Amino acid sequence: MRNLNIYNIRKWYKMLAGTSILHVNQGVGKIYSKNDIGGYYNDLTEKVLRGKNLQKVKIPRLQLKNGQEVVFPIAVFQYGLGAYDLYLIEKKEIYINKFKLTADWALANQEENGAWNNFFFNNPEAPFSAMAQGEGASLLIRAYKQLGMIEYLEAAEKAIEFMIMPVGDGGTTLLRAGAHVVDEG
């Protein structure tokens, strides 16, 4: 019963009613290809289309149960990947602008070691996530391909290096039964 509070009830209602931007259908990407870096393999376009700010170019924010708004890196990366797919499909300038904004945010907010501080608001002792690292790298590789700035590629490489670094060294990879497993934090 600890999780039963007005914040979670609202969150669950939005999820069940199909109005949550955090919980959208994520089938196979609409223009995903195994042969080319283009569309993302998950369909994240609803992350962009369902948002309140469809006609605005701004970084998405997450509202915490205490009412505070934070920028959650995974949400930014998924929004950017969805915007890029929409740009590839529709060729609308608004989508490439949203995509570029998220890629620039990723550059500006990446730590020196290649990480993004993903769970700073609820788990500051273990704020890193392999999911954030992978999605951030995916966003930045597409930004490099589309926009040509070498800084995007360099940041993607740093993100992957951090993702495969062992947890004991600060990264997000665990060794279990001789296999490397990426950790969600």
What are these regions (language model features)?
Residues 1-185:
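Glycan-recognition and catalytic cores of secretory/periplasmic carbohydrate-active enzymes
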